[in-house]
């Protein structure tokens, strides 16, 4: 399945065409990541596994990687399994998320389904406490008379939160921290 033309295009786009005579062990970490990305994408393998593919890349190159990934998926429909710790950059990229913590699978679900289960509820402490009844409270922070809680519930429970409280959606990174932050999980059931 190796796609020579695609590999050449990626090498040129990443500026690696000028480095052809450089030994691989002499490349920077970012350049090594670009070589790995080129090999993975140009392989055209039906299942492609990438472990921390953006390590060492600057923000522009990381953004371009995710664009390339989406373009490739759109053209071929092949499956990509990507492990990363830079979750903010993956918003809107992955259909499914698997969250691991110390080797244990905490979540294995469609990304949208996971995100719709979490909210950051903020407002007067008493009102937030009352609103969180029946929800799983994963973290809480008090500032004066205000209380902020990260909560998990069904979409119906979250839709029923009082309109006078701020109840913002969380991005994937915030959900990950809530699930893996190892703080005390407080149940208000």
What are these regions (language model features)?
Residues 104-127:
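Conserved beta-strand-loop-alpha-helix hinge in the C-terminal portion
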Residues 127-132, 156-160:
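Short, conserved charged micro-motifs
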Residues 87, 128, 172-173:
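Alpha-helix N-cap/helix-start and coil->helix boundary motif
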Residues 139, 143-189:
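C-terminal coupling/interaction segments
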Residues 1-101, 106-107:
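ABC transporter nucleotide-binding domains
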Residues 18, 125, 153-155:
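Non-catalytic surface loops within mature trypsin-like serine protease
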């Amino acid at each position: 399945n190796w796609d020579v033309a695609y590999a050449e295009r990626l090498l040129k786009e990443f500026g690696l065409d000028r480095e052809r005579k450089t030994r691989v062990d002499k490349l920077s970490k970012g350049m090594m990541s670009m070589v790995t990305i080129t090999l993975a994408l140009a392989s055209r393998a039906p299942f492609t596994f990438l472990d921390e593919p953006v390590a060492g890349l600057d923000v522009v190159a990381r953004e371009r990687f995710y664009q390339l990934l989406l373009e490739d998926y759109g053209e071929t429909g092949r499956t990509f399994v990507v492990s990363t710790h830079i979750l903010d950059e993956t918003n809107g990229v992955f259909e499914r998320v698997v969250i691991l913590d110390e080797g244990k699978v905490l979540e294995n679900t469609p990304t949208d389904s996971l995100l719709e289960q979490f909210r950051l509820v903020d407002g007067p402490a008493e009102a937030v406490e009352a609103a969180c009844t029946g929800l799983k409270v994963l973290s809480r922070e008090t500032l004066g008379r205000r209380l902020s809680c990260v909560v998990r519930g069904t979409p119906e429970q979250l839709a029923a939160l009082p309109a006078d409280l701020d109840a913002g959606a969380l991005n994937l990174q915030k959900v990950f921290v809530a699930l893996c932050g190892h703080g005390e999980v407080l149940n208000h059931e």
